[in-house]
């Protein structure tokens, strides 16, 4: 086994040894000279200081602070202090006032007589002319008594509705404001005016004129979110909860009262055991959603900020992640057939009399008569049925028809009289022919207007023009 060496203890300093061994006399030979300053170096400095004065420079084994007085600048004169005394104010002369003196001091001095001065000398002589003065010796006295002060009187009225009886209220008069009466003088004469024509500022142009005082050159567009740069990680989310409840993918908290259309901020990232979806690990902030179009699809996007690490200074570092989910593809535009909302007007008045039937151009109609009898029994006619075969492109359809019968014309009422005399005579009931319309005639022609109708209108029902025949109802 390897023996462990004892840890080496630090030796005491010379100052610590000097405190304990000086009294006992057991100090090493190099401790006492070092502490007391009697080494060879200290002695050389002491001997050299006897011939060279180095005082005040701090050269030696001292602390180097320049001695007690410190360092002084070289070749400088000490500054002198100038004593500036403040002059004393002159004393105020106090004049004593006796009990008999008035206590009111007039601001204006008493008026005095103004001397007119010396008289004008008179010169007399033979030569020249004589000057005679008309001046008087009466002195002029000026009355400088101060005029009386002007007194300005103003009145102000304050109306308080709380202390004013409603029946005493008066309508305020014109020109009265806060108790001061204002008097205005109407202007006299007529004043002319100048008619200034109005100018039109908006004039028709080419459409390229600027609409502001400082037009912005070019087209300014709002920059969209930079979601597909190299610094943003792209993550596709397939969970439908990302559209309605994105918070449920990052935490198990209750999102009932949390708005999902705004930025979601977490105080701190959740641990991996608390995140339902691993793609949303270390998410600190999830920005508001945005709808964009990408390669023919509608895309729902959110940008998230992760907090992967934190420095000692407290700054967080993390990547930006773009979470997206494609909603639906954008299909091509469908062509919608436009239909008129107003029905077209009729071409003519006779179009409203026709009914729409099958196209006679595409059908072959053949009539087969099984027989015809005009037997009358007690005033009633026996009608034999006819059949019609309609051949169309969809198949043969048999339609039953009723052939017309000949109705004999008789004068008088519709009562059949017996051929032989029979008594008593019992009249028969009238012939019942109200079920069908019978047309009896040898030939007929179409209405002349039908020859001018176009082909597409021939499918309508047209009226008949009888050449020779009768109609019985």
Swiss-Prot record:
It is found in: Virion; Host nucleus; Host early endosome; Host Golgi apparatus. Its main location: virion. One of its GO terms (biological process) is viral penetration into host nucleus. GO terms for cellular component: host cell; host cell endosome; host cell Golgi apparatus; host cell nucleus; viral capsid. Disulfide bonds join 21-27. GO terms for molecular function: DNA binding; structural molecule activity. Interacts with major capsid protein L1. Interacts with E2; this interaction inhibits E2 transcriptional activity but not the DNA replication function E2. Interacts with host GADD45GIP1. Interacts with host HSPA8; this interaction is required for L2 nuclear translocation. Interacts with host importins KPNB2 and KPNB3. Forms a complex with importin alpha2-beta1 heterodimers via interaction with the importin alpha2 adapter. Interacts with host DYNLT1; this interaction is essential for virus intracellular transport during entry. Belongs to the papillomaviridae L2 protein family. This is Minor capsid protein L2. The lineage of its organism: Viruses, Monodnaviria, Shotokuvirae, Cossaviricota, Papovaviricetes.
């Amino acid at each position: 086994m390897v023996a462990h060496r004892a840890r080496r203890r630090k030796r005491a300093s010379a100052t610590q040894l000097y405190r304990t061994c000086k009294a006992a006399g057991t100090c090493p030979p190099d401790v006492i000279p070092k502490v007391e300053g009697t080494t060879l170096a200290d002695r050389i400095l002491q001997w050299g200081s006897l011939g060279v004065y180095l005082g005040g420079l701090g050269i030696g084994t001292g602390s180097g602070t320049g001695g007690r007085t410190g360092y002084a600048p070289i070749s400088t004169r000490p500054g002198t202090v100038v004593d500036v005394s403040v002059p004393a104010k002159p004393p105020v002369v106090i004049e004593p006032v006796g009990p008999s003196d008035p206590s009111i001091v007039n601001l204006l001095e008493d008026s005095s007589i103004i001397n007119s001065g010396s008289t004008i000398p008179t010169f007399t002589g033979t030569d020249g002319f004589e000057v005679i003065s008309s001046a008087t010796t009466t002195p002029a006295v000026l009355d400088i008594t101060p005029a009386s002060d002007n007194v300005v009187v103003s009145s102000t009225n304050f109306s308080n509705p709380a202390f004013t009886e409603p029946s005493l209220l008066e309508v305020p008069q014109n020109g009265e404001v806060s108790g001061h009466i204002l008097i205005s003088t109407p202007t006299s004469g007529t004043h002319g005016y100048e008619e200034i024509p109005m100018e039109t500022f908006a004039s028709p142009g080419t459409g390229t004129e600027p609409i502001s005082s400082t037009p912005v050159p070019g087209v300014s567009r709002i920059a969209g979110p930079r979601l597909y740069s190299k610094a943003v990680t792209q993550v596709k989310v397939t969970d439908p909860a990302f559209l309605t409840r994105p918070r449920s993918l990052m935490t198990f908290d209750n999102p009932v009262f949390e708005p999902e259309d705004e930025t979601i901020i977490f105080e701190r990232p959740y641990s991996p055991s608390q995140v339902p979806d691993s793609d949303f690990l270390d998410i600190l902030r999830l920005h508001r959603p945005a709808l964009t179009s990408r390669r023919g699809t509608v895309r729902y996007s959110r940008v998230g900020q992760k907090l992967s690490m934190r420095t000692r200074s407290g700054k967080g570092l993390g990547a930006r992640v773009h979470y997206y989910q494609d909603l639906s593809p954008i299909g091509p535009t469908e062509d919608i057939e436009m239909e008129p909302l107003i029905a077209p007007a009729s071409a003519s008045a006779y179009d409203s009399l026709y009914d729409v039937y099958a196209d006679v151009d595409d059908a072959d109609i053949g009539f087969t008569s099984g027989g015809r009898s005009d037997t009358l029994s007690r005033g009633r006619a026996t009608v034999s049925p006819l059949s019609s075969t309609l051949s169309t492109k969809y198949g043969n359809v048999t339609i039953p028809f009723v052939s017309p019968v000949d109705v004999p014309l008789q004068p008088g009422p519709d009562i059949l009289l017996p051929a032989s005399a029979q008594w008593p005579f019992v009249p028969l009931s009238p012939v019942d022919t109200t079920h069908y319309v019978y047309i009896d005639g040898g030939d007929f022609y179409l209405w002349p207007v039908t020859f001018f109708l176009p082909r597409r209108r021939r499918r309508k029902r047209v009226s008949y023009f009888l050449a020779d025949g009768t109609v019985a109802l």
